Design a protein with these regions (language model features):
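N-terminal secretory signal peptides that target proteins for export/translocation
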Residues: 1-2
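Bacterial N-terminal signal peptides
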Residues: 5-16
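Short amphipathic alpha-helices and their capping/turn segments at secondary-structure boundaries
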Residues: 19-21, 151-158
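Loop/turn elements at helix/coil->beta-strand transitions in domains of secreted/extracellular proteins
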Residues: 22-27, 57-62, 116-122, 158-163, ...
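Hydrophobic residues in beta-strands of the RecA-like P-loop NTPase core, especially within AAA+ ATPase
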Residues: 27-31, 253
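Active-site segment of extracytoplasmic enzymes that catalyze sulfate/phosphate-ester chemistry
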Residues: 28, 35-108, 113-119
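Active-site-proximal cap/lid insertion segments
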Residues: 36-46, 69, 92, 98, ...
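Conserved S-adenosyl-L-methionine
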Residues: 60-66, 123-126, 313-314
């Protein structure tokens, strides 16, 4: 299936050759623990204007899937453009044990390829920390921290393109206990003026409508609203710094909602994710129903930057 999905994803875009001075920036916005509960994707009880606007300006993929519904395995796959089982990275956080995992000979993380091509490479959380602390990596193999130049692309040389990743907490914002969820929803009330009431939550049919589950889903929808707000801030940074018009933005999550039948499960709720790609050379307002995988963003990003796709990349 990977050959089919990569062809479908690349076939959407016009990958005309570009000069070094015209090379686009590439920004991946990767969100934790969130399914496609955005207004542009489905009927939801919240508004997501920034995600919707990004989708309207680019391509919205309606059948995008991750190859693993847990973060470290998923991230190990998309940072290399390889199935996790092909590189020995399929056990969750196996790289944290006493026995370290190395990538097979010749396999390289995509930031190394961008950096080698002259790109300034960054990875950060949001807001970007002034101390240049890197954002979430969570790879199940040993990697060279030097493949990242820092956390903020604003520190690059003049006219130098950047390859950046911004890692957002997404569904994790709501916390893991009733107390942390309540604190989070109080902060939502302060920011938005109201929290999502349980009365508007429509649960999937396989969930019992108990107070615990309804409250958690209401908090989850608030985390979706918050993620949408943060995306708006990220896009504003691009516009303020004059980079928006020359930046390809990839918006995706690392797996579905953290709930039974979601995160860690191979049900659709765990592996189906939103995927939106927008930027120069990409016509807006398009939707695709082709089945694509999250590892497809890796060769696609290289192609859109007019960089060679390694033969080993899946």
């Amino acid at each position: 299936m990977f050959r089919f999905s990569v062809v479908c994803l690349l076939g959407v875009f016009c990958c005309a050759p570009v000069s070094a001075s015209e090379r686009p920036n590439v920004l991946w916005v990767i969100v934790d623990d969130m399914s496609d509960h955005f207004a542009c994707y489905r009927d939801v009880p919240i508004e997501t204007p920034h995600v919707d606007a990004l989708a309207a300006s680019g391509i919205q993929f309606n059948n995008a899937f991750v190859t693993a519904p847990v973060c470290s395995t998923c991230r190990s796959a998309f940072i290399t453009g390889m199935y996790q089982t092909s590189i020995g990275a399929h056990h969750h956080r196996s790289g944290r044990g006493a026995i370290k995992i190395d990538l097979p000979n010749g396999i390289r993380p995509v930031p190394e390829l961008f950096k080698e091509a002259g790109y300034y490479t960054t990875i950060s959380a949001w807001p970007i920390r002034k101390d240049e602390r890197l954002g979430k990596t969570d790879y199940n193999f040993r990697w060279d921290p030097g493949m990242y130049d820092g956390a903020d692309w604003a520190k690059r040389e003049n006219d130098q393109p950047f390859f950046a990743q911004i890692q957002l907490r997404g569904g994790k914002l709501r916390g893991g206990t009733e107390e942390s969820t309540e604190r989070y929803q109080k902060s939502i009330e302060e920011r938005f003026g109201t929290r999502t009431p349980t009365s508007v939550v429509k649960l999937p049919p396989y969930y019992p409508a108990t107070d615990v589950i309804l409250n958690d889903w209401a908090a989850y929808f608030d985390s979706v609203r918050d993620t949408d707000r943060i995306l708006g801030e990220i896009l504003l940074k691009l516009k303020t710094e004059g980079d928006f018009e020359n930046t390809i933005v990839v918006f995706m999550t690392d797996h579905g909602i953290s709930h039974i039948r979601g995160k860690q499960y191979l049900y659709e709720e765990g592996v189906r994710v939103p995927l939106i790609i927008a930027g120069p050379g990409i016509d807006g307002g398009g939707q695709r129903d082709d089945m694509v995988e999250h590892i497809d963003i890796t060769p696609t990003s290289l192609a859109l930057a007019d960089l060679e796709i390694p033969v080993w990349m899946q």
